[in-house]
Amino acid sequence: LRVAAAFVTALALLPSQAQQARLDEVKATAEEAYLYGFPMIVGYDVMNKFFIDRDSGQFKAPINTLSNEARVFTPKDTAISTPNSDTPYSMAMLDLRAEPMVLCMPVIEKARYYDVQLIDLYTNNFGYIGSRATGNGAGCYLVSGPEWQGEKPPGIAKSFRSETQLGLVIYRTQLFNPADMDNVKKIQAGYKLQPLSTFLGKPAPPAAPAINWPKLTPEMFTTGFAEYLDFLLQFAPPTGTAAVEKPMRDKFAAIGIGADRKAPPKTPPSPEVKAALGEGVKEAFAKIGATAEGVGTTVNGWQIGSAAGSREFYKGNWALRAAAAKLGIYGNSEAEAVYPFTRSDASGIVLDGSK
């Protein structure tokens, strides 16, 4: 964990009352940072298993490559907690640093629902393609990163801008019944994902620098979260619509998040600071759980509502965004789908997946 040496030294020199005030500040900052970053860390866990670690047991495809799965998910698919079972998935992790990516859709019969969900590294849904949003006709769509300054080229129906350099695209194609799977396969074969340069028939720009991906550890969800959030935020510049978050993110530097990544390693935190960080994480996780319990309204024992959406939907409510990641990361926005949840049966007995 990268905690500034000066900060640690200052704690050691302060009188006890002032030192406690600073420890309280560390705890509060850790709580805020964990609420803010929890969805990003959960998302990295999924992306790493699906698109980065070829030995994860759930690897699907390299980055910027579309993976089609003409099957329904089963309990063995553990990376995402609540996948659909009637909309076979196609997925891709996007790296938009070098250039935009172009997504081309085939004609899909009007009776069949499909959607293509565009998700940034924050887990905000920043755009949709599909039956509701754009219709079932053929078309090509451009997805760019935050720094891209180009114009929408000919042949592109619509452009989408991600606030982050890394993102995810999830396709859902309706399956009418088991015998319909071959039709789903044909539709999935018509989905195309390619770099803009390939779409235009031009030379590719220079490749983006290689990324040293951190390995997954249990500590990434506890006291080690700051290292992972610090790593992820380098791909999420606080510019454009994300600029409103800069003052908050500047505060995170006190616990080693967002500090100068080129600086030498910082002094490890003292036991007191580490304990304060742990308390902040504990408070944040409790708040995430409480927020998840309160999502939507209860109807006949079912908790019905949506915790997933765009930046505009969340309005800075980081606890709600974190609750969405806890309930089922990468959920659709409410305009696209509604998710009923329950934890007990009609008799009030808590459901147990092991049975």
Predicted regions and their residues:
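Sec/Tat signal peptide C-region and signal peptidase I cleavage site
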Residues: 14-18
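Bacterial N-terminal signal peptides
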Residues: 2-12
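A compositional/structural signature for long, glycine/proline-rich flexible linkers
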Residues: 19-355
